[in-house]
Amino acid sequence: MSSVLKADVLVVGGGTGGTAAAIQAARCGAKTILVSEFTWLGGMLTSAGVSAPDGNELAAFQTGLWGAFLQELQERQPEGLDWGWVSFFTYDPRIGAAIFADWVKCLPNLHWISGHKPQAVIKEADRILGVQFTDFTVLAGITLDATELGDLLALGEVSHRWGWEFQAEFGEASAPIAPNDLTQTYPVQAPTWVAIMQDFGEGAVAPEIPAPPIHNPDRFTDAWDNYTPEQFLNYGRLPGGLLMINWPIRGNDYGKKVDRLIGSETSQQEFLQESLWHSQSFTHFIQTQLGRRYGLAENIFPTSHTKNPAFALHPYYRESRRLQGITTIREQDILPITGGRVAKLPINAEGICEAVAIGNYANDHHYPSGDISLQPKSIRWGGRWTGTAFTIPYGALIPASTDGLLVCEKNISVSHIANGATRLQPTVMNIGQAAGMAAALCIERGCQPRELPVRVLQEALLQDSQASAKVIPLFNLTPDRSHWLKQQRYYCDRPSSYPASGNCPLSVDRSILVGKRQCRVPTLDRGKRQCRVPTLDRAQSSFSGIFHRRGEQDYALTLTEPLSIAHRTWKLVTLDPETDELLINYEAEKPLTVWARPNFSGVWLLVFRVELKESGFLQKS
């Protein structure tokens, strides 16, 4: 007879959202059980191998558990996070997994059980009471579906969606009018089985990567045709010569008969095996084309599921079953206000702002046959492209007609089109934190999730003692500012006053900023690199030269110091709003000194402090 465990909160799934939810619920005092399929926690950030997260990269958006995770990464990876060009934060996935494991160990009221998948949902009328696993059952006051594919939604017969919606349903401009070849071939976005390769160095001969049983190298022809081989490899470069292989252009995305993921166990395993072979085939192709100095990395992932430590424990899933919730996030809910940089705040029928998490990723869809045309939601900020900001409403986490359940992964109530922006790791981590906080509050107050006042949840997130989380996106307000909490509360209570610019009114004394502002992110030495780069003292963080303005929010610096790379021109980018403001208002072709970290893959300087003379500012009429 299987044992019965009881908890206040049960989290099923140890991915990005589930791990955050379990940690947050336990930190709030709820007796929490976390059941995961895999031996690593973190999902997309770790066990799926995508250790180069996208979105919420701006300093103002690095809050909550996402911000805490970045701080831990900076401390535990002393070589720095500036390795690849696809992300500002590239790290060894083993470090990410260790962070989550350590956080869980610190919580005596959080019981983590790994190696189990849900088998059945225990339900009474329209209320979820718990979940049955192979060897045990967990009964809980609140259950959270944090599985990668929304398994509890199917097992519990909770209303959900899978696949495309057409224009008539939500009025989304980017949705197709009717079924077509793309919607029928790829009902959801293609997953990717990430691999980690190793650059063993000039003259080295790595072990040969065997071709898998299913191998067709023609699928990868021209995969990096618009890039140099070095640019291709540097896309997901990690420390220690590691290379994350998650390439979207004729690479290792795999979507053939992707419906098998929600079919029988046999059909699901068939898809997973083919996806793994497809990724192995791509790494074989890379080695064949670029040489034997590149091979599969050793001892990265546990081998419980793939038998090869270079391949992630499971695919990077971009889409899941999606809840039919109280609120559904549509494309128009993530797009910026006309002429603005942010989406409207979600306001319910009672006029209450429902925002509980933030995101800013530009909508991005992956289909092996090519991309679709999507409404633009990108802006220039900090010398580069980023996404316009949006929020996740609390109602998207709550089933329309089922109690005792919250969702906190890619299974939230969102359209297929809008999922392309809400699915990213930092946003899902924010969603998980909000769901975990909501679950703990429901236990404390003896209520169902739909009965919890959203303003109570917002306040708890804003005032969390260990990882306070922003719920209103404000580009120019970082968490270290004294009036951060006041401004967050102001727009929660007065959502109609939320500025289309995403900037709240600030009074900034420029004299404090010029040459005196301290770095928000620690200066870290990068150590030795294994790609071809100029000689540069890694301890050197000061760069001087002539400032160039090449267009709107497009900056460069032709260096005069350090001498080892003098006369070279580097892009200037920043994640800091005060530095962004200084660069906007600095005159072109004037001398400029910045404190920055170099990214050799992207050929940019990530600026965290500016020293300049008042004469360098543009004069405003």
Q: Model regions: which residues?
A:
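Beta1/beta-strand and adjacent pyrophosphate-binding region of the FAD-binding site
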Residues: S3-G15
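Flavin (FAD/FMN)-binding glycine-rich loop and adjacent Rossmann-like elements that form
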Residues: M44, F136-I142, A146-C519, D537-S542, ...
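Short, low-complexity intrinsically disordered segments enriched in A/P/G/S/L with frequent Arg
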Residues: V521, G527, V533-P534, A539
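OB-fold (S1/OB) nucleic-acid-binding surfaces
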Residues: G551-L575
